[in-house]
């Protein structure tokens, strides 16, 4: 749906809007959610040690603050910097991985997708749908996309492609 919304909102503006204007508008629209989610996640993380999150107690505050900064800048965290034990790209705000892919989709829209013909977009949608069906059938679900490794990035891009392009 986000691809339809982006196209509907911006397709007719490109004659009087630069790439910078587009990206600025998208940052203003999306990034406050990112920062707020990271701050709430950092507070919950810091005060949530124990129970199912025993790894939290051993995380130095400085490392948590570094993860917070990286998260606020939407820089994915590699598994080696994990602080919760789940290999998430954004350990302080798990769902932020989907916004990471949304940013990528916005970049693809601005640089490539908006210039494609309807026929080519339709063909891309069919290809993306095939990848989505393949993922669901071979994996048995559509779960994934939140870790910075090849398999999870593949799931994330697959989950992004069809809904955005179609």
Where do the protein language model's features map onto the residues?
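Hydrophobic cores of alpha-helical transmembrane segments in multi-pass inner/ER membrane proteins
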Residues: 1-4, 37, 162-166
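Divalent metal-coordination and catalytic microenvironments
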Residues: 3, 27, 102
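Hydrophobic alpha-helical transmembrane segments of multipass integral membrane proteins
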Residues: 3, 39, 129-132
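Active-site phosphate/pyrophosphate-handling residues
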Residues: 4-5, 106
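Structural signal for the C-terminal ends of transmembrane alpha-helices
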Residues: 6-14, 43-49, 111-119, 166
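Transmembrane alpha-helical segments and their boundary/interface "anchor" motifs
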Residues: 10-70, 105-106
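Aromatic-enriched alpha-helical transmembrane segments of multi-pass intramembrane proteins
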Residues: 62-166
């Amino acid at each position: 749906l986000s691809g339809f919304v982006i196209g509907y909102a911006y397709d007719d503006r490109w004659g009087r809007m630069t790439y910078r204007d587009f990206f600025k508008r998208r940052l203003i629209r999306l990034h406050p959610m990112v920062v707020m989610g990271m701050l709430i996640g950092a507070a919950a993380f810091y005060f949530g040690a124990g129970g199912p999150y025993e790894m939290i107690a051993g995380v130095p505050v400085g490392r948590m603050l570094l993860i917070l900064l990286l998260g606020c800048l939407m820089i994915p965290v590699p598994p080696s910097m994990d602080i919760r034990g789940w290999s998430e790209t954004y350990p302080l705000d798990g769902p932020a991985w989907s916004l990471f892919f949304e940013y990528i989709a916005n970049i693809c829209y601005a640089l490539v997708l908006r210039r494609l013909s309807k026929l080519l977009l339709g063909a891309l949608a069919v290809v993306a749908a095939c990848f989505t069906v393949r993922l669901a059938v071979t994996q048995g679900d559509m779960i994934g996309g939140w870790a910075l490794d090849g398999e999870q990035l593949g799931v994330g891009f697959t989950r992004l492609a069809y809904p955005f392009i179609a």
